[in-house]
């Protein structure tokens, strides 16, 4: 009897060990990287929430790939928007043997990190990095599901001149890969138009005092100030513009196109004064799916979507769709499928060109009224 009991116990332990091993083999680890600390932590958390929402939904429904059942695990990391920390985190994810990465959040961290993922053969989809260089380094593992700065800068310049009737434009950029890249594209597209650049100034992504550059700009009498940078800087800048009596309109890209701008600007923001563009958007026929996502997001997290949560959500679902079509979560096997995929998401159909840029990317132009973001139009 004791021998039988011992045998049963050993069998149970062996079964438990086998079950544990099987569970480990059935786990797919997806990395997510954004700045979840620092000045743009609110935007980073927005991205992370979008990815986490996708993971939770997939796990709730059950995931089968190649006839095997899997469970997704999101390994969320913080790069603080710092390129050096971004590469450190990227190597950490490679060492953790993640099956794919959603991120990084901004261009300054996505670009250096992309080399590390490429060397490891790990697919990476950024839901928000817009600098063209990110997908032009020859790395077949780098993708993005938002428009790039060439598209964004061109659309904003066109809107500024044709709709906003701007004629004298001052430009400020924060010297980051994102801010400088966007400002350069905007300036390039203004040249040859009926408008002209009357002043070009520089700041940093951590600055809080803009008195000197705004005083210089005021003397040039612009009717529009274009800012290449993030909302954490744009808000205080708008407040100081009012203090100096600068009544120009204010324009920027996706980095300053969140509901945080009115909060940071306070009474420095007039209704309709700010025009910004999100490097993504949906056609009217796709609006319901996006609205449903926003409602579900608010129910889950208790806050509204800021900017790129739906793109992080779609990026993760697109990656998993590629795994399912390939019949394997092995990066080497699903990467070729990801490159040619067409995934119907809440932000529209996600498909990539030969460089890894999203095909047929649209942009959404917004303003702010009553402290809330208001959509004006969708552009290509």
Predicted regions, residues:
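N-terminal signal peptide c-region/cleavage motif recognized by signal peptidases
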Residues: 19-21
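Extracytosolic ligand-binding ectodomains
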Residues: 2-11, 23-380
């Amino acid at each position: 009897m004791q021998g039988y009991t011992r045998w049963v116990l050993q069998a149970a332990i062996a079964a438990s060990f086998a079950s544990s091993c099987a569970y480990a083999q059935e786990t797919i680890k997806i990395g997510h990287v954004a700045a979840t600390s620092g000045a743009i932590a609110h935007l980073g958390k927005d991205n992370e929430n979008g990815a986490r929402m996708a993971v939770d939904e997939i796990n709730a429904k059950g995931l089968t790939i190649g006839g095997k059942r899997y469970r997704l695990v999101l390994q969320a990391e913080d790069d603080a928007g710092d390129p050096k920390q971004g590469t450190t985190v990227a190597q950490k994810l490679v060492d953790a043997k993640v099956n794919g990465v959603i991120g990084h959040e901004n261009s300054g961290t996505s670009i250096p990190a992309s080399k590390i993922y490429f060397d490891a053969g790990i697919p990476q989809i950024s839901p928000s990095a817009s600098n063209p260089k990110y997908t032009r380094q020859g790395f077949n593992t780098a993708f993005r599901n938002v428009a790039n700065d060439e598209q964004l800068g061109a659309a904003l310049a066109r809107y500024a001149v044709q709709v906003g009737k701007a004629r004298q434009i001052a430009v400020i950029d924060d010297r980051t890969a994102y801010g400088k890249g966007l400002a350069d594209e905007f300036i390039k597209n203004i040249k040859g138009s009926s408008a002209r650049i009357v002043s070009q100034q520089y700041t940093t992504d951590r600055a809080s005092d803009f008195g000197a550059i705004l005083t210089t700009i005021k003397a040039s009498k612009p009717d529009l100030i274009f800012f290449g940078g993030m909302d954490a800087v744009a808000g205080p800048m708008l407040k100081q513009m009012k203090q100096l009596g600068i009544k120009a309109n204010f324009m920027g890209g996706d980095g300053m196109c969140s509901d945080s701008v009115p909060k940071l600007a306070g009474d420095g923001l007039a209704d309709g004064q700010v025009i910004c563009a999100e490097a993504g958007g949906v056609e009217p026929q796709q609006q319901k799916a996006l609205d449903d996502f926003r409602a579900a997001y608010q129910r889950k997290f208790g806050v509204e979507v800021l900017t790129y949560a739906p793109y992080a959500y779609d990026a993760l679902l697109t990656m998993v769709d590629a795994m399912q079509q390939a019949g394997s979560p092995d990066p080497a096997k699903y990467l070729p499928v990801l490159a040619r995929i067409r995934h119907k998401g809440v932000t529209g159909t996600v498909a990539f060109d030969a460089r890894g840029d999203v095909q047929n990317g649209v942009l959404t132009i917004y303003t702010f009224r009553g402290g809330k973001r208001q959509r004006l139009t969708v552009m290509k």
